[in-house]
Amino acid sequence: MGRIIGIDLGTTNSCVAVLDGDKPRVIENAEGERTTASVVAYTQDGETLVGQPAKRQAVTNPENTLYAIKRLIGRRFEDEEVQRDLKIMPFKIVKADNGDAWVEAKGQKMAAPQVSAEILKKMKKTAEDFLGEEVTAAVITVPAYFNDAQRQATKDAGRIAGLEVKRIINEPTAAALAYGLDKKGGDRTIAVYDLGGGTFDISIIEIDEVEGEKTFEVLSTNGDTHLGGEDFDNRLINYLVEEFKKEQGMDLRNDPLAMQRLKEAAEKAKIELSSAQQTDVNLPYITADATGPKHMNIKVTRAKLESLVEDLVQRSLEPLKVALSDAGLSVSEITDIIVVGGQTRMPMVQAKVAEFFGKEPRKDVNPDEAVAVGAAVQAGVLAGDVKDVLLLDVTPLSLGIETMGGVMTKLIEKNTTIPTKANQVFSTAEDNQSAVTIHVLQGERKQSSYNKSLGQFNLEGIQAAARGMPQIEVTFDLDADGILHVSAKDKSTGKEQKITIQSSSGLSEEDIEKMVQEAEANKESDKKFEELVTARNQADQLIHGTRKQVEEAGEALPAEDKEKIEAAVSELEEARKAEDKEAIDAKVQALVAASQKLMEIAQQQAQAQQAPGGEGEQEAKQDDNVVDAEFEEVKDEKK
């Protein structure tokens, strides 16, 4: 079996790690960074950029640069959160035929898992470059509070990227694994506060150690899948837009280019204000009107930023209370607090968390890397490389079916350890009813319509009988990824229907297969593009080298050969402008053939240089008379 890698697929940044010996190691990408921006761009010349290269060109290509896609994964277009994002994202969010929230770039509609797959492909390639072998399996992390549809969509993204997703693991649980793996000395109860780019989770986890074997048991989890650093950025962006409007009377929201520049500046200002008390948002030529160009120069203090986001930080504290209550613990029973996710670097967030728990969060956990490291540990457990670690995770939300009167009847309660199985016997609501619809729900409300619909299916062929007589056994089987499999069986006839819940929205098997094939086709076209670029570079080098040699050969090169070479160079220059690698290769060979005489002359000249008494030797003799001197640099006092 090949290596299994651990991937933290984040809203703002992603990270990949692998077990290197018995220690997890975060792998640097091609740009030398330990994290990769979760940004995907589709350029005018058909290239797909991921990470920093995509981020760099965002200002000039805002409509086709996609970021924070994780906020859309597994979501319906009509969802309130999607409608909020619709107003602030510079790219198009569109409604798919199945009701999902998709995106549009360069006139093409794409599912969120398709875009996320591009980020996963980059992570896969990063790992392959480091390991020197193909990688086909991964453990991918998701927010603990992700529902079934969002987990399924993340798995789909993995498949599209060419990865077998061995396990979906909750981010706070992964962070706890990273933290607790090498900690010695007794049992601990830890709180993992995870405020990332787009999602927020809190998990209460108990770490027990018995005879060297560690058990990580999640006691409870809670969160908000639409609260994160992006929301903090948006508050600052809105403030800057309003301030500029007051000063200049112009609304920048109508200018996608200006908004993209503003997004970058706001993110930078927010980061700076974690260490400084004040910063300037200085954007010259942000826009223009009939009177000329307009510039933005607005001072932002840390206090101002804190006043803009105070309610968001406060919002993150509510799930803490619920999680503690669900775990049956008081604040004083928490031994350690771990904060992960980039947004936890904000001093105000750290202060509020410390105030809530009555103690400072630990500083020995890297908030950007802990989740990927934990995923790599779990990958090691699955591969059999890490022994003595048992992970017991939970389902974040209750699961059940709709019963008479639009009530949700729960079969699996929230915070139940997974994998788990539950069954319950139901019956018909009317006489001689021959079919029942099983409507599967996820959530905590009694009224079905307020919960998340995960899908429905029919059990047909029920024997005619008075209402309440048939016995229909519904079984919920929740796997270790937190993905649900449901079956319904008529106990009298033995007829059975089974489904793996694939939200009525989610991607069908056909869709995924098509996207996998597209990704494979793109792999081929990417390879061809790379080969074309290599051929062009070789052509450039040959042209440059040949011209230099022609110059050096001077009169020694017959005029007839010189003409042949110049013609071949011109033809190669023309060929390299086109998209045909074979044509470039052919013209390279033609230039090499035309340069035979030139090569001979160059060789003769080189030999003459090396010969005794030649120029090279004379220079060497002169060099013998050179005396090495030591110089001391004199500093200019005025500087």
Swiss-Prot record:
Pfam families: HSP70. Induction: By stress conditions e.g. heat shock. Gene3D superfamilies: 1.20.1270.10, 3.30.420.40, Actin, Chain A, domain 4, Substrate Binding Domain Of DNAk, Chain A, domain 1. InterPro entries: ATPase_NBD (IPR043129), Chaperone_DnaK (IPR012725), Heat_shock_70_CS (IPR018181), HSP70_C_sf (IPR029048), HSP70_peptide-bd_sf (IPR029047), Hsp_70_fam (IPR013126). The keyword Phosphoprotein applies. Residues 625-639 have a biased composition (Acidic residues). The keyword Hydrolase does not apply. One of its GO terms (molecular function) is unfolded protein binding. Keywords: ATP-binding, Chaperone, Nucleotide-binding, Phosphoprotein, Stress response. The modification Phosphothreonine is found at residue 199. Residues 603-639 are annotated as: Disordered. Residues 603-612 have a biased composition (Low complexity). Acts as a chaperone. Belongs to the heat shock protein 70 family. HAMAP family: DnaK. This is Chaperone protein DnaK 1.
